[in-house]
Amino acid sequence: MKKLMLKTGIIVATLLISISGMAQTLLKQDVQIFPAPEKGMVKYVIEVPHAGIAGDSNKKIEFFAGKYMDTDACNSYFLSGEFEKKDLQGWGYQYYVFKTDGNVGMTKMFCQGEKKNTFVPAQSIMTEYNGRMPIVIYAPEGYEVKFKIYKAEPETYQAAAVAVKSTK
């Protein structure tokens, strides 16, 4: 009897894990509906776990494109370029195309020392966190896409009111 209960428990646990994995897979949108990358471009996909409506609503995603370059230790570097938001016709989804001329700006401090290989990003985009939909980004070959996830804490804070003096 104990063996039968143990086998039944193992089977049920296996089924639950399988169903859970299938549900997570089914929630994600197939990225094949997005256009194939044009020549010289790479398609990047950001997929994040779905945390339910309440869990997703208090998060944001910041993503940025850039490339690794030899830089000095004391100047700040930034890549020129911007993201263009496009609509996936017939689906109601959006995707982003990163466009750049490859120019890099920097501060002009005098630095001595070794060069180091650093990721130099362009201006970032902040968007809603949605664990059910991937974020699709196209960037030129030689560039990479990175992202950060921001999460709001449940605490809220009161702003201070400022009294205005009368001018009478």
Which stretches of residues belong to each language-model region?
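A structural detector for beta-sheet-dominated domains
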Residues: 34, 47-49, 64-66, 99, ...
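N-terminal signal peptide c-region/cleavage motif recognized by signal peptidases
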Residues: 18-19
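N-terminal export/targeting and maturation segments
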Residues: 23-70
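Mature extracytoplasmic domains of secretory-pathway proteins
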Residues: 55-123
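Bacterial N-terminal signal peptides that target proteins for export
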Residues: 1-10
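Extracytoplasmic
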Residues: 41, 91-93, 132
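C-terminal partner/receptor-binding element of secreted or periplasmic proteins
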Residues: 128-168
